[in-house]
Design a protein with these regions (language model features):
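Non-catalytic interaction-recognition regions
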Residues: 1-174
Length: 174
């Protein structure tokens, strides 16, 4: 298992490093930088996926269950969860997650996968901001907790999808 995870991280690091730059860029490859868990790297994005999966594991639920529960929330609750500056990161995360189709169209039109790579990195950053600001598993309001879990589920779905399109596997653990 550890060998498989190490391979996923190494291959993901290399692929992301090669895909994050546009075709006309000069590449100076540094494996140490590519394998870093900080900055614009494949492992940073893979770690975001693992972190989200751990939220669901610790919460004894699944992303699908969170989204099903979210569908049953009242619209009145949603308005209060999105109001105010304190929830700007939630808006940013949902907006970024919803842009994948637009980004893919841009990649196709320009033959540049770098746009999708950048999108995946920015989505991982948006999730990190959201995660640091909102205590998902310890949220006391059940409806708000459902909303936060659904937000994490959307981020997970979009990150895994973006990585898959880049040919990068999403490890179960790191």
């Amino acid at each position: 298992m550890r060998q498989k995870i190490a391979e996923q991280i190494a291959i993901g690091a290399l692929r992301y490093f090669m895909l994050k730059v546009t075709r006309n860029s000069v590449i100076a490859f540094d494996f140490k930088d590519a394998l870093s868990f900080e900055g614009e790297t494949g492992p940073y994005i893979q770690y975001a996926v693992v972190r989200i999966r751990n939220i669901f594991r610790k919460g004894n639920t699944t992303p699908d269950a969170a989204l099903a529960d979210f569908a049953n929330l009242s619209a009145a609750n949603l308005g209060s969860y999105l109001a105010g500056d304190a929830n700007e990161d939630i808006w940013s995360l949902w907006l970024r997650a919803g842009r994948r189709t637009q980004i893919l169209e841009q990649c196709i039109a320009t033959s540049e996968p770098a746009y999708l790579a950048k999108h995946a990195f920015q989505l991982a950053q948006e999730f990190a901001n959201f995660y640091h600001r909102h205590h998902i598993l310890t949220e006391e309001d059940p409806a708000r907790k459902t909303f936060l879990l659904a937000t994490a589920a959307i981020a997970l779905r979009e990150l895994v999808g973006a990585l898959a399109l880049l040919g990068i596997e999403s490890p179960e653990a790191m």
